Design a protein with these regions (language model features):
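Short conserved beta-strand segments at catalytic cores or DNA/RNA-binding microdomains
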Residues: 60-63, 123-139, 148-149, 157-158
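Active-site beta-loop-alpha junctions of metal-dependent nucleic acid enzymes
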Residues: 42-49, 87-91, 142-165
Length: 236
């Protein structure tokens, strides 16, 4: 453990603990005191980190509303408001999504990708959720965009290439005219592009999972919150 202020290694553990039983430390160089989760996003919260992590995991993994989660934990003797769940989700979801994306670089994907987009309403406007899976059904990448155009398609393929560290041999999509040029620009001219609605049925069915979770939320209040939520559940 190093000091959070001066980065000194001259740190001494204190005998007392925090209210949540986390260890306290004191820097002998600058005299600052801190605890073992001071550098994290949950430093000021009055609940244990493992409880908050479980709340956010259930929120992303299952079709549960904010009030559902608050009630479930209240029955178990842990009381917090549904607004606390919203705050924890906003803090932890980007961290969780980034870590899951980093770990996916180690996975080996099939050389054939299936790409499609579905519609999600954000503040009364339709946005486009780009998703790609490989031949075996493993997720390649996901991206929410306010537009369905060439720039969005290019951004999605570049993101997929950066996340996976791989380029497919073949990409199957619907007939939208932005895909051919986006594939050539982002993935290269050697990638074969197939346009077939029936071949893409497996991805159409795969949309149901994320759509079902979004349906119970009664919409999104902002594009930022929608993009944040759509990234993590797809990766779980």
């Amino acid at each position: 453990m190093r000091c959070l202020d001066c980065d000194s290694a001259a740190v001494t553990e204190r005998p007392e603990r925090t209210a949540q039983r986390y260890r306290r430390f004191r820097c002998r160089e600058c005299g600052k005191q801190f605890n073992e989760r001071s550098a994290g996003v949950l430093n000021r919260t009055q609940y244990p980190s493992d409880v908050i992590a479980l709340v956010v995991l259930w929120r992303l993994r299952y079709r549960l509303t904010l009030r559902d989660l608050a009630e479930m934990f209240f029955i178990r003797g842990i009381a917090f408001s549904y607004e606390a769940v919203r705050e924890w989700e906003a803090k932890l979801t980007p961290i969780l999504a980034d870590e899951l994306r980093r770990r996916r670089r180690r996975r080996r994907l099939a050389p054939s990708w299936y790409v499609d987009e579905t519609y999600i309403k954000v503040r009364g406007r339709w946005c486009y959720l780009y998703r790609a899976i490989d031949r075996n059904g493993a997720l390649v990448d996901v991206m929410l965009s306010e537009r369905r155009d060439l720039a969005a398609a290019k951004a999605f393929f570049r993101s997929a290439k950066a996340v996976t560290g791989a380029v497919p041999d073949r990409v199957t999509s619907d007939g939208h005219d932005s895909y051919p040029q986006a594939i050539r620009s982002a993935l290269g001219k050697t990638v074969t592009h197939r346009t077939n609605v029936y071949l893409n049925n497996r991805l159409e069915q795969d949309h149901r999972g994320i759509k079902g979770r979004i349906r119970c939320m009664r919409g999104f209040g902002s594009f930022v919150s929608a993009r944040r939520f759509c990234r993590a559940p797809a990766l779980l």
